[in-house]
Amino acid sequence: MSEPLKPRIDFEQPLQSLDEPVLKSAQAFDEQAAEKFYPAAPELDAEDEEGRVEGLVNAALKPKRSLWRKMVTAGMVILGASVIAQSVQWVNQAWQQQDWIALGATTAGGLIILAGVGSVVTEWRRLYHLRQRAEERDIARALLVSHGVGQGRVFCEKLARQAGLDQGHPALQRWLASLHETHNDREVVELYAKLVQPALDNQARAEISRYAAESALMIAVSPLALVDMAFIAWRNIRLINRIAALYGIELGYFSRIRLFRLVLLNIAFAGASELVREVGMDWLSQDLAARLSARAAQGIGAGLLTARLGIKAMELCRPLPWLEGDKPKLGDFRRQLMNQLKNTLPKKDKTAH
């Protein structure tokens, strides 16, 4: 038997029609506007901000070329030309008069001058390479927002040669195998930053961790503050030299001083807020006084300063800017330092008893 029909249902209000979405009018971009478009990159904006602060600091500390400075430079140039002319005249007179002693002395002095000029040229070349690394980072920033094709691969292959990576290196082989003819410059540089650059960054991180641990242990176990200061200064200079060598930069005397100065300026002016943000609250929440002695806490502080120095040296020596999530954090090194100190100091106490 069939079921009875349901009664009719009357609605008090009429059914509301669904509102159709309002679509914006289509916008057409020409080729010139499309070339200027690039996605937002907060990490690159942060890099640009740090570079701007560093540039302002360097401009403020750079001595202005006054009139007296120009006069001294002109006088030194004239004096150098006069010395060269007088030396040529002495050599000519000694040769004509057969004064072999004067001729030998003049020749020895000329060789010393040539050696000094060669050293100056070598130092200038190394300083130029250090300055060129900053220009390469600017080129990399431009390529990371570029839609062009062809320049990214040439640029990355140049970076690989500077780093001493041959064609048989596994990371370089993976990068070459990942490339496709449809990739633009931004994608090529990003692949290089993710596949090849970490091979060098991991070595630099290991060096920073080792040097920071040595500084922390030295402060924790040594009772002599003067010896601690000298040791940390020496190890920090060694760390900067090591990081520069890993990234293919050969440092001379003046280039080493310039790099060390840039690192310290960057830490003092651009890194204070970041240091507080990464370590400050987490440091207070650890209650270090309950876990370690005051001397060990001082060692952790010295180790963190060494790690901070190494991170900024990495930033100045890397040919590429930091991408999102690539930059080392002090929190990682802090945890390593605490674990090493907790494992080392009890052993020393047991051996002492």
UniProtKB/Swiss-Prot annotation:
Keywords (A to Z) from UniProt: Cell inner membrane, Cell membrane, Membrane, Transmembrane, Transmembrane helix
One Pfam short name: DUF697
Species classification: Bacteria, Pseudomonadati, Pseudomonadota, Gammaproteobacteria, Enterobacterales
The species this protein was found in: Yersinia pseudotuberculosis serotype IB (strain PB1/+)
Subcellular location: Cell inner membrane
Family to which the UniProt record says this protein belongs: Belongs to the UPF0283 family.
Highest taxon of source: Bacteria
Membrane spanning stretches: 71-91, 101-121, 214-234
InterPro entries: DUF697, UPF0283
Main subcellular location of this protein, as a coarse class: membrane
Name of the protein in question: UPF0283 membrane protein YPTS_2342
GO cellular component: plasma membrane
Membrane-topology annotation of the record: Multi-pass membrane protein
